[in-house]
Amino acid sequence: MIIREVVRPLPGARRLSLLRQRLAYSDSARFWERNYARGATSGSGSYGALAEGKSRFLNTLVRGHAVRSVIEFGCGDGNQLSLADYPRYVGLDVSRSAIALCQRRFADDPAKSFFLYDGTCFTDRAGMFTADLALSLDVVYHLTEDTVFETYLTHLFAAGRRLVVIYSTNEEISDTAPHVRHRHFTPWIEANCPGWALTGVTRGPSPDRARADFFVYERQ
């Protein structure tokens, strides 16, 4: 896989805007709690054609692999989930407001459960939070802190009994907003998640230069 670092000169107005955003930014968890608490959504990737494209891929994968249960680390506002066809589902998120949104939205669905996720307080040696498929959609490139990134992936792969699917960019890209940090994440998984193999990479529906793809891992 070819790695490229995209660095472009920024216009003055955009440079100033990014500076202001960076000064206001504290950490990823607080950013997303503020986002949902003020009524904002999970973003354009969870709506419209992008959301539909992701759901087609995932629903096909779930059927093709006879997946009976899914756990998602980063369920957001639940709009992407509304397009999913999963037999049983557990959604985790760092934002209390996002969890409350999902609990209300899917209150009448007995096959879905939601829990607040805090990586610093999450220990699951008993395997209570596991599923056939562990899912991460548009999350990895929002993990701006190294420790948060590493803890998140450790928990994600521990939760997958058979499959892990990550939808993310996989390259270093500069000049981004402070809540975005594009990473070349696959080498970290190869080095730190033994017993897993990357068995497929499928191009995602995003046309952007910072294109996210589906990375499918299977337990060996």
Name every feature range the model reports, one short phrase each.
Residues D138-H142:
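Short catalytic micro-motifs in class I SAM-dependent methyltransferases
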